[in-house]
């Protein structure tokens, strides 16, 4: 049961958030009338069907290719599936994606892992963007049409990163006919949300189009005290400058005000589970974590004819956040029940990022066969700065984790904020790729990238100039439905550790080998795949054995190596016109092949060896197929985390979700989602004995009314 007591500031924020909801409530209510009026004048009513449960086409490789034509594992989660499962944030989308492990509150943000490595490559409409940073707010999915996830290394188009995955968020774009989508939802723990999505032509010819999206949310959590109020606005316009040229530009803004939960729960000092209630909140009631994120963007695309196109895209981001918290820190002694004390701090984070990507692509005829070429380049410039303030008076309060009152500690002041200085990161690269038709059933994919990378931080500078990243793949069509493929992909990651000569180590290199089979069944409506993969990451930093550390001063050599390997199976799309399915299974093991401390040990023990995820939905034949039922299963094996001399463990678990929806008429649909039906108690992530161990969500429900015109 959630505690109703809140701080005055928290009550004020919730009242303000509810006030902000009224404009969108009115928009949802008024849109049917506006739609009917416009339909009577010029346009018929249009039903927005979304982008499917698993669209067949992915754009993260610049070329609009089917999943079958990409020689790596790809998952596409479309708008229809996000609506069915009520996936309203990127965290929720990733929790249901094949092979992804989600770990909340890792360095103040949510971390995603694929194949044992942290995902650090993110794109928006194919342009590399800043995410996974303390200043960048969590992503609201109201803006996006679909999410594309390419697993493995992707250094060819993205540059520096880990051999984990690339996540491409594809924005909603204006349509040539009027369309409206409005949603009102209410759920467990006082979660309320309103969305409105309106777009269409802005002149008679349709050569000027626009689309606006707004969303407000006011929510609590399954743990006490914490809440969050968020507001989002997205606007985009498109202009046909000519029959082959389109200019688009837009703005995206998100504001979040939250009472956060930094502490999570601790463990016993021997690593055992204390068994605290899932509603436990071990922070101070005055905690807050706030974000303001603004992104402006523009694209210019031109078709030259005969299949050749050129596109240039630019993004500019400003992201600011501030955090003030106090939370329980310290492992608990089994005998005394003591060990935690209140610790806290105050921080401000400022970020800017400018990014640009430009490319040309098109077909060529060589030796009597048609091939495709892609030539381009991209660049990013990021600045970031962290300010730290000391709480005054400093907190050193014992915490009884079995009977803690979050309101018992008065809010302290904050001393002057200080910063060591600004960190600047620049990366540029040029890339080329060709898809060469060697024979009717055989396509060879070859590519390469040259990257220039440099970073200046307080007291340190680093430059990589240049770094070559190769790529290769082979696709063999067995028949019209099935293909075999193999690929070789590489990526590099700079390191900041210094050798005894005072020079930074060479970059870590990640190499991804993959082979598999893909099928596009039922005329491409159902995609299936089976893949095996082998990843090696070399040149990892190791302490120099010939130069022992003196205090905190250590020297390093590039001697570390890890390996990750496994296989994946996935099926997604339409089994029949009324039955959709999205299922994925991943088996993955990882190991330190060469490490001065952990040699021979598992590399990423916190990622399960086995992950199975399923979502399916079926429109029943009765009642003109107005009633549909759906369900999902998430199964995974156990995982562990090493914390000093002890190991924390979470056993395997299974979660079951259910959904029922009823189409009231051709415009209105009501749905009910029930998640974690059997109320399974589990830890979503384990960090250590002292704090930041996170329960997964208990059983919860969400009721949604959706209007589409």
Where would I find each of the regions flagged by the language model?
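Membrane-embedded beta-barrel scaffold of Gram-negative outer-membrane proteins
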Residues: 301-305, 309-315, 319-327, 484, ...
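C-terminal beta-signal and adjacent terminal beta-strands/loops
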Residues: 634-642, 661-709
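Surface-exposed extracellular loop regions of Gram-negative outer-membrane beta-barrel proteins
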Residues: 257-268, 383-385, 474-519, 524-557, ...
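Structural signature of Gram-negative outer-membrane beta-barrels, strongest in the C-terminal barrel
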Residues: 238-240, 351, 370-374, 378-382, ...
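Gram-negative outer-membrane beta-barrel transporters
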Residues: 441, 557-643, 678, 708
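Short acidic/polar hinge/loop motifs at secondary-structure boundaries
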Residues: 102, 111, 127-151, 169-171
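Acidic/polar loop-and-plug regions of large Gram-negative outer-membrane beta-barrel proteins
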Residues: 217-221, 234-303, 316-351, 395-423, ...
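Outer-membrane beta-barrel translocator/receptor signature
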Residues: 142-145, 156-235, 241-245, 294, ...
């Amino acid at each position: 049961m959630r505690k109703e007591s809140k701080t005055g500031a928290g009550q004020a924020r919730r009242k303000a958030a509810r006030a902000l909801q009224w404009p969108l409530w009115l928009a949802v209510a008024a849109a049917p009338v506006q739609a009917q009026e416009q339909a009577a004048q010029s346009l018929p009513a249009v039903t927005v069907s979304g982008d499917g449960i698993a669209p067949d086409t992915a754009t993260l490789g610049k070329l609009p290719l089917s999943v079958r034509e990409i020689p790596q594992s790809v998952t596409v989660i479309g708008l229809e599936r996000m609506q069915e499962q009520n996936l309203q944030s990127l965290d929720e989308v990733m929790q249901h994606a094949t092979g992804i492990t989600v770990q909340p509150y890792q360095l103040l943000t949510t971390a995603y892992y694929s194949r044992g490595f942290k995902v650090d490559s993110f794109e928006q409409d194919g342009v590399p963007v800043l995410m996974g940073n303390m200043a960048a707010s969590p992503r609201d999915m109201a803006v996006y049409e679909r999410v594309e996830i390419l697993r493995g290394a992707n250094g060819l188009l993205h540059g520096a990163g880990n051999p984990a995955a690339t996540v491409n968020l594809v924005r909603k774009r204006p349509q040539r006919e009027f369309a409206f989508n409005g949603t009102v939802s209410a759920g467990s723990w006082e979660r309320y949300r309103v969305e409105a999505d309106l777009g269409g032509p802005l002149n008679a010819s349709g050569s000027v189009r626009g689309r606006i999206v707004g969303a407000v949310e006011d929510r609590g959590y399954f743990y006490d005290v914490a809440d969050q109020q968020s507001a989002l606005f997205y606007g985009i316009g498109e202009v046909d400058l000519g029959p082959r040229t389109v200019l688009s530009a837009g703005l995206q803004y998100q504001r979040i005000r939250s009472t956060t939960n930094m502490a999570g729960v601790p463990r016993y000092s021997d690593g055992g589970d204390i068994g605290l209630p899932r509603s436990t909140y071990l922070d101070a009631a005055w905690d807050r974590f706030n974000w303001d994120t603004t992104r402006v963007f523009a694209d210019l695309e031109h078709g030259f004819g005969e299949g050749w196109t050129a596109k240039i895209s630019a993004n500019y981001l400003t992201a600011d956040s501030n955090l003030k918290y106090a939370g329980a820190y310290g492992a608990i002694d089994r005998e005394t029940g003591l060990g935690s004390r209140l610790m806290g701090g105050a921080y401000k984070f400022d970020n800017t990022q400018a990014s640009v990507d430009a490319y040309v692509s098109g077909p060529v005829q060589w030796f009597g066969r048609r091939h495709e070429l892609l030539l381009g380049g991209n660049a990013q410039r990021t600045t970031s700065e962290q300010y730290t303030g000391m709480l005054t008076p400093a907190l050193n309060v014992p915490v009884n984790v079995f009977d803690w009152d979050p309101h018992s500690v008065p809010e302290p002041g904050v001393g002057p904020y200080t910063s060591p200085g600004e960190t600047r990161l620049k990366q540029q690269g040029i890339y080329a790729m060709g898809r060469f038709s060697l024979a009717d059933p055989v396509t060879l994919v070859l590519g390469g990238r040259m990257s220039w990378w440099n970073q200046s931080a307080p007291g340190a500078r680093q430059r990589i100039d240049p770094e070559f990243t190769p790529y290769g793949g082979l696709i063999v069509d067995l028949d019209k439905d099935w293909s075999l493929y193999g690929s070789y992909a590489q990526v590099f990651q700079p390191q900041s550790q210094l050798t005894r000569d005072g020079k930074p180590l060479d970059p870590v290199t990640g190499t991804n080998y993959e082979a598999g089979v893909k099928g596009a069944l039922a005329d491409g409506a159902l995609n299936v795949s089976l893949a095996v993969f082998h990843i090696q990451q070399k040149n990892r930093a190791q302490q120099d054995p010939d130069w022992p550390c003196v205090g905190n001063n250590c020297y390093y050599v590039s001697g570390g190596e890890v390996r990750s390997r496994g296989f994946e199976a996935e099926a997604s799309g339409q089994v029949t016109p009324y039955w959709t399915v999205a299922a994925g299974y991943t088996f993955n093991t990882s190991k330190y092949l060469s490490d001065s401390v952990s040699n021979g040990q598992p590399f990423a023990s916190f990622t399960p060896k086995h992950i199975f995820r399923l979502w399916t939905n079926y429109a029943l034949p009765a009642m003109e197929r107005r009633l549909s039922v759906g369900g999902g299963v998430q199964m995974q094996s156990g995982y562990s985390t090493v914390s000093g001399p002890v190991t924390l463990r979470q056993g395997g678990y299974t979660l079951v979700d259910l959904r029922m929806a009823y189409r009231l008429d051709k415009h209105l649909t009501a749905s009910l989602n029930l998640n974690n039906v059997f109320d399974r108690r589990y830890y979503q992530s384990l960090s250590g004995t002292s704090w930041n161990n996170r329960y997964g969500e208990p059983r919860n429900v969400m009721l949604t009314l959706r209007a589409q015109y």
